[in-house]
Every structure is written in C-alpha cells, then in structure tokens.
C-alpha cells in the first residue's frame, strides 16, 4: 500500500532537519493518511478509501464525494477513484437522459 492519498494524489515529500548549528540532514514529510468510508449519494453505495485529512476537509467543503470527483482532475485520482468517477458520470448521464 503506497503512502499516497487516493483523491488528491498527495504523497511523501523530502526536506531537511536543520539543527541549531545549521547542519542539514535529510528527512521525509509523510502525509497524514487515514482510512475513510465515503458515501456516494448518486450511486447509493459506500467506498472505503485511504485519503489525507486535508482531502477529508475538502470533501466536506465541496459537498460530498460525487461533486469532488466530478470536479477533480484525472491525473490526481487513483485507479480506484477513477472507476468511481466513471460510475458517477454514467449515473448522472443516465439521470439527465431520463429527465
């Protein structure tokens, strides 16, 4: 399992620990990932994804999983999230044709 957010694509970053005497040693900044079960309103289904805490706040701000996925770029999303996005798009298209 990679240390990468499935929705935003945020992964580990590198930097330095800097001591008082200005000696720099390499270190990694890992994203704060947590497993989250997210509900898709249009599909009526829940999905378990490993996302960052920042992505969870963004989901709340955007109004849910469906609206976040429809506005997200495909390059950021994991293969699992891309499949969910395709299902949401297909469901929205079917609903638009029925109405």
From Swiss-Prot:
GO function terms (MF aspect): structural constituent of ribosome
Single GO biological process annotation from the record: translation
GO cellular component terms, semicolon-separated: cytosolic large ribosomal subunit
Keyword Ribonucleoprotein assigned: yes
Keyword Kinase in annotation: no
Residues forming coiled coils: none
Alphabetical keyword list: Ribonucleoprotein, Ribosomal protein
Family annotation (NCBIfam families): L28
Similarity field: Belongs to the bacterial ribosomal protein bL28 family.
HAMAP family, sorted: Ribosomal_bL28 (MF_00373)
Protein name as annotated: Large ribosomal subunit protein bL28
């Amino acid at each position: 399992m990679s240390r990468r957010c499935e929705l935003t694509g945020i992964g580990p970053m590198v930097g330095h620990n800097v001591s008082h005497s200005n000696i720099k040693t390499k270190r990694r900044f890992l994203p704060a990932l947590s497993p989250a079960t997210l509900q898709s309103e249009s599909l009526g289904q829940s999905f378990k994804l490993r996302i960052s805490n920042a992505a969870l706040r963004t989901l709340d701000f955007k109004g849910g999983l469906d609206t976040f996925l429809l506005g997200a770029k495909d390059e950021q999303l994991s293969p699992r999230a891309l499949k969910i996005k395709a299902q949401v798009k297909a469901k929205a298209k079917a609903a638009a044709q029925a109405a």
